[in-house]
Amino acid sequence: MRTLFIGDLHLSADRLDITQAFTRFLDTELDDADALYILGDLFEVWVGDDIALPFALELAEKLKQVSQKLPVYFIHGNRDFMLGKQFARAAGMQILPEVTCLNLYGIETVILHGDSLCTLDKAYQRFRKLRSLSLARWLYGCLSKKTRQGIADKIRSNSKSSNQQKSYTIMDVEPNAVDALFAKTHTKHMIHGHTHRPAIHQLANGCQRIVVGDWYEQGSVLSVSAEGINLQSLPFEHTT
């Protein structure tokens, strides 16, 4: 048996090929799985459970079927932090705290989306702090659907433009932030996404940091079992 970790699918109505690839993954890769963890940014944007698009509702039904066979866990990302209990319930997903520790076959491991580790990106961290406030989230939820969608589109556009001007270092995790989280959680193994740079990093003091990749051009899945770990790519099946 094995536990699977994915993240950064960025599903949207504009990229239904990714949704189709994810659906195939759910159909074919979970037979021997103990659990599925989705480490944030399942959707490209999420402005509220009351504005779920048809493709997202269909996906919720699929995930609900999966959840009847094995637990499905979800950690919010920077694109879908407004995903709430209503959609999670419909999808059979259990929402976890943004930093969660678990025992993986005898190994204490900390899992998270990963954006909190990119501490050199000061502008984003200020936005992240604001959006984490309960009052800010409540006020945003009180806005009309059209206004929320407009704000989300503007933020996404600004983020894309800003990221193109940021250096590789600023966009990656900051080593001191990684060390601090290891110390805070008393763990030596970490799994996260967000950076879209899949890799297995062997660090000092026997620590290990694993980054799951995005699903823009191919799938990325981390499999963890008692026998070891496997970070693999899943090619998309392109139809003509």
From Swiss-Prot:
From the UniProt record, give the pathway where this protein acts.
Glycolipid biosynthesis; lipid IV(A) biosynthesis; lipid IV(A) from (3R)-3-hydroxytetradecanoyl-[acyl-carrier-protein] and UDP-N-acetyl-alpha-D-glucosamine: step 4/6
Q: Which residues does Mn(2+) 2 bind?
A: D41, N78, H113, H194
Q: Which InterPro entries match?
A: Calcineurin-like_PHP_ApaH (IPR004843), LpxH-like (IPR043461), Metallo-depent_PP-like (IPR029052), UDP-diacylglucosamine_Hdrlase (IPR010138)
Instruction: Describe the reaction catalysed, as an equation.
Output: UDP-2-N,3-O-bis[(3R)-3-hydroxytetradecanoyl]-alpha-D-glucosamine + H2O = 2-N,3-O-bis[(3R)-3-hydroxytetradecanoyl]-alpha-D-glucosaminyl 1-phosphate + UMP + 2 H(+)
Q: Please give, as recorded in its UniProt entry, the membrane topology of this protein.
A: Peripheral membrane protein
Q: What does this protein do?
A: Hydrolyzes the pyrophosphate bond of UDP-2,3-diacylglucosamine to yield 2,3-diacylglucosamine 1-phosphate (lipid X) and UMP by catalyzing the attack of water at the alpha-P atom. Involved in the biosynthesis of lipid A, a phosphorylated glycolipid that anchors the lipopolysaccharide to the outer membrane of the cell.
Name the gene: lpxH
Give compartment(s): Cell inner membrane
* Cofactor binding description: Binds 2 Mn(2+) ions per subunit in a binuclear metal center.
Q: What is its main location?
A: membrane
State any GO CC term. cytoplasm
**GO molecular function list:** manganese ion binding; UDP-2,3-diacylglucosamine hydrolase activity
Query: Which residues hold substrate?
Result: N78, R79, D121, S159, N163, K166, H194
| BP GO annotations | lipid A biosynthetic process
Residues annotated as binding Mn(2+) 1: D8, H10, D41, H196
UniProt similarity note:
Belongs to the LpxH family.
Name the UniProt record assigns to this protein = UDP-2,3-diacylglucosamine hydrolase
Query: Which co-factors does it depend on?
Result: Mn(2+)
Name the Enzyme Commission number(s) assigned to this protein: 3.6.1.54
Q: Which SUPFAM superfamilies match?
A: Metallo-dependent phosphatases
Keywords noted in UniProt: Cell inner membrane, Cell membrane, Hydrolase, Lipid A biosynthesis, Lipid biosynthesis, Lipid metabolism, Manganese, Membrane, Metal-binding
